[in-house]
Structures are given as C-alpha cells and as structure tokens.
C-alpha cells in the first residue's frame, strides 16, 4: 500500500456554512466542574471550542465527542430545543 500526502488549503464547508442549525443534541459545559484539561478542544472535530472553553454553536454539529472525552463529565449533551 502506498501513502499519499496532502495539504488542505481551505477549510471544509463547515467554516463556510453554519451547520449548527440541524443539530439534535447540544453540548453544555459546567465550568465549575471543568479542570482545564483541554480534551474538548483537542478532540472536537470541528474546532468549535476555544481556549476559554466557549462553544461556537453556529458550527457545532452536536456529535458529543467533547462530552465523551471529558474526564470529569463537565460537558453534558442536551436535546436541542
């Protein structure tokens, strides 16, 4: 099997189009429980969580990876209203 290298010159369509409008579940962070491990930032596939642990809901797809990776369960997924 051969390897193929590539460079992404432009972000995918997520940055061009707000995708948060069709989300079913929404992450909520309890900052009192947060231990600043930054797992949520590291594992978010859309890069929707900033250094202050604010979530950009315009682009969050509600996948729940941030909640799954949080070691202290400071992020809860709630049904979108």
Swiss-Prot record:
| Cofactor comment text | Binds 2 [4Fe-4S] clusters.
| Residues holding [4Fe-4S] cluster 1 | 34, 37, 40, 70
GO terms (molecular function) for this protein are: 4 iron, 4 sulfur cluster binding; metal ion binding; oxidoreductase activity, acting on the aldehyde or oxo group of donors, iron-sulfur protein as acceptor
> Which cofactors does this protein require?
[4Fe-4S] cluster
For this UniProt record, give its keywords in alphabetical order, as a comma-separated list. Answer: 4Fe-4S, Electron transport, Iron, Iron-sulfur, Metal-binding, Repeat, Transport
The cross-references to PANTHER family, in alphabetical order and at most eight, read: PYRUVATE SYNTHASE SUBUNIT PORD
Specify the protein name: Pyruvate synthase subunit PorD
Give me the gene this protein comes from: porD
């Amino acid at each position: 099997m051969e390897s193929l290298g590539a460079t992404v010159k432009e972000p995918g369509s997520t940055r061009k189009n707000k995708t948060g409008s069709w989300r079913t579940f929404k992450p909520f962070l309890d900052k009192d429980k947060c231990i600043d491990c930054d797992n949520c930032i590291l594992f978010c596939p859309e890069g929707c969580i900033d250094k202050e642990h604010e979530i950009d809901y315009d682009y969050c797809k509600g996948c729940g990876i941030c909640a799954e990776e949080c070691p202290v369960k400071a992020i809860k997924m709630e049904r979108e209203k």
